């Protein structure tokens, strides 16, 4: 991993490390990742046939899904088919992401958007796949990154752009993996000094 490129970065790293030590993110981490290992095991290709509606709802809620009523309208068969396609089909990642997120996609589930789909990818492999939620975009903006490409074009290409920026945040701020990037983003948006300054402005 690269060294901090400035005192600004170094200070943010120190402040984030100190914040983690205080437990300020414990509730968020428990809510979002407390059952990540269990979820990941249930999403293994050989286990998908055992996926239940209750478990799929738990995964949806952990991803911060807010349209529970809509999501409940999906059959467990459709949910399983979408997960199987997303995680195990041979077409490129951007194609799979598009088909699961776009309103025109063949595997779009009711109530499920980029947050749920990126969460599924992430819990299967947090070293490769980042989470695309509100904090991810807001954090990038607070850190001064250009996020215009996240607002236009095919969904799959947008996710690839989000991943690229997530990898760069991981390297720049010396974070362990993309799960740490998500926690860092959450902290930046809600608790960091730059978020407080932004609120004042």
Pin down the residues of each PLM region.
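Contiguous, well-ordered alpha-helical segments that form the cores/surfaces of helical PPI scaffolds
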Residues: 117-124
């Amino acid at each position: 991993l690269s060294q901090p490129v400035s005192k600004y970065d170094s200070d943010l790293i120190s402040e984030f490390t100190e914040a983690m030590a205080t437990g300020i993110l414990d509730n968020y981490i428990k809510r979002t990742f407390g059952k990540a290992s269990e979820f990941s095991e249930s999403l293994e290709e050989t286990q998908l046939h055992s996926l239940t509606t209750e478990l799929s709802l738990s995964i949806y809620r952990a991803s911060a899904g807010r349209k529970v009523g809509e999501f409940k309208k999906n059959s467990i068969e459709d949910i399983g088919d979408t997960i199987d396609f997303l995680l195990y089909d041979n077409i490129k990642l951007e194609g799979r992401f598009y088909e699961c997120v776009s309103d025109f996609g063949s595997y779009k589930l009711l109530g499920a958007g980029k947050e749920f789909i990126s969460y599924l990818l992430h819990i299967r492999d947090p070293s490769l796949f980042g989470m695309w939620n509100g904090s991810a975009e807001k954090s990038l903006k607070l850190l001064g990154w250009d996020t215009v490409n996240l607002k236009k074009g095919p969904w799959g290409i947008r996710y690839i752009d989000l991943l690229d920026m997530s990898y760069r945040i991981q390297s720049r701020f010396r974070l362990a993996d993309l799960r740490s990037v998500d926690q860092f983003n959450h902290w930046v948006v809600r608790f960091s000094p730059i978020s407080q300054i932004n609120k004042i402005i």
